[in-house]
Design a protein with these regions (language model features):
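Adenosine-nucleotide cofactor-binding segment
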Residues: 169-232, 280, 284
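Hydrophobic/small residue at the entry helix of a nucleotide-binding pocket
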Residues: 131-134, 159-160, 228-229
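NAD(P)H cofactor-binding loop motif with strongest signal on the N-terminal glycine-rich segment
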Residues: 155-156, 225
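NAD(P)H dinucleotide-binding glycine-rich loop of Rossmann-like/cofactor-binding domains
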Residues: 72-79, 90-155, 301
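Glycine-rich beta-strand-centered segment in the early N-terminal region that forms part
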Residues: 30-48, 56-100
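N-terminal Rossmann NAD(P)H-binding glycine-rich loop of SDR-like oxidoreductase domains
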Residues: 157, 161, 165
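C-terminal capping/lid region of NAD(P)-dependent oxidoreductase domains
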Residues: 2-5, 301-308, 316-346
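Glycine-rich phosphate-binding loop and adjacent beta-alpha segment
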Residues: 228-302, 335-346
Length: 346
């Protein structure tokens, strides 16, 4: 049996600047199971994440560049359509890193069977997936956040940032949230109940703004953007404060990345700790996160919002819009229009 797979490929590398839809191509090819790749999967949901931008250049990074003309990759949830593997059955819902395509064939070691949950399956790409895990590990392992502390979160209207805000509130922290639109400010204030949210695009001087809204300073800054925002935050960190570097979305597409931080003296004077981390280094640390996040979700203490584009043809647009900040919460591409919910056995 063979089927046609539609997929997104990169037409050329993008060393600087924002990607354009013309940098991508929707292609098709015939696929079929064989002795080595003996499972056929149809994707239902594809995760769209900022880290993918780093794979669109030829520069050495923590993941290799996408191959020109071949299938791009990304996290996805799908359903087994055909299987010659004893461990997977038709209808099984699975997680893989073989996104950016509607169908694929693979071996069993490329799939993870999903556990039963009483919520939509795309939660495994959001609060129960890399999004939630990144927020959890960043806050507790690297940020060492404690109850009652004050935290600044940039890109707080995105998937990771909004999860960081809610975990910190659950811990009894004061949360200052920065985002790029009034709509996101409203969501952060009125639904997620952060202590203060602001649209950074409307702030003329971030350093003065930080002094005004948080005169005592920040214990922790969860940095998703880098650049000038990071430099401004350093001025208002408390002595022995911590800065966790999770992303640098403000610089990913810059044609001129600038000269770097000009206030490193404050890192010395304030005895700050600045630490970067990659969630890919923590795959073996999921159990405590999954237990706690599942409880928060069940208790309604973590809310998640999604921005959804339909069809593999719209995957390039979804990625470009993500980089332009047009998403609220998690950016997803919906491939299979059937709605799957995994139910726990009664």
């Amino acid at each position: 049996m063979s089927v046609i797979s539609k997929y997104v490929s990169l037409k050329n590398y993008i060393p600087t600047g924002l990607p354009k839809e013309t940098d991508f191509e929707i292609k098709s090819k015939e696929i079929s199971i064989n002795d080595e790749k003996n499972i056929l999967v149809s994707n239902s949901w594809i995760s769209v994440d900022p880290y993918m931008r780093a794979r669109m250049t030829e520069r050495k990074n923590y993941k290799p560049p996408f191959k020109i003309g071949e299938e791009m990759e990304g996290y996805a949830i799908g359903k087994v359509e055909l299987s010659n593997d004893k461990d997977f059955s038709v209808g099984d819902l699975v997680f893989s890193s073989l996104g950016m395509r509607d169908k694929f064939v693979c071996s069993s070691d490329e799939l993870k069977k999903l556990k039963p949950i009483d919520m939509p399956i795309q939660s495994y790409l959001g609060p129960l997936g890399m999004t939630g895990h990144t927020a959890y590990i960043g806050l507790f392992k690297h940020g060492e956040l404690k109850s009652g502390q004050t935290i600044l979160v940039s890109s707080a209207g995105g998937s990771v940032g909004s999860t960081v805000c809610q975990i910190a509130k659950n811990l009894g922290c004061k949360v200052i949230a920065s985002t790029g639109s009034d709509e996101k400010v409203d969501w952060l204030k009125n639904e997620l109940k952060v202590d203060h949210a602001f649209n950074y695009k409307k702030v003329e001087n971030l350093v003065l703004h930080f002094k005004e809204i948080c005169p005592d300073g920040f214990d922790l800054y969860f940095d998703n953007v880098g650049g000038d925002f990071l430099e401004s935050a350093i001025f208002q960190m408390k002595t022995y404060g911590r800065i966790v570097i999770c992303g640098r979305i403000s610089q990913m597409n810059a044609t001129n990345p600038g000269s770097g931080l000009k206030n490193m003296a404050y890192v010395l004077v304030k005895r700050l700790t600045i630490k970067g981390f990659l969630i890919f280094d923590h795959d073996n640390e999921r159990e405590p996160f999954e237990t706690e996040m599942s409880k928060w979700l069940a208790d309604g203490k973590i809310k998640f919002k999604e921005t959804i584009y339909e069809g593999i043809e719209n995957a390039p647009k979804s990625f470009i819009d993500l980089l332009n900040g047009k998403n609220i919460g998690k950016m997803l591409v919906k491939i299979d229009f059937r709605k799957f919910v995994i139910k726990k056995p009664q």
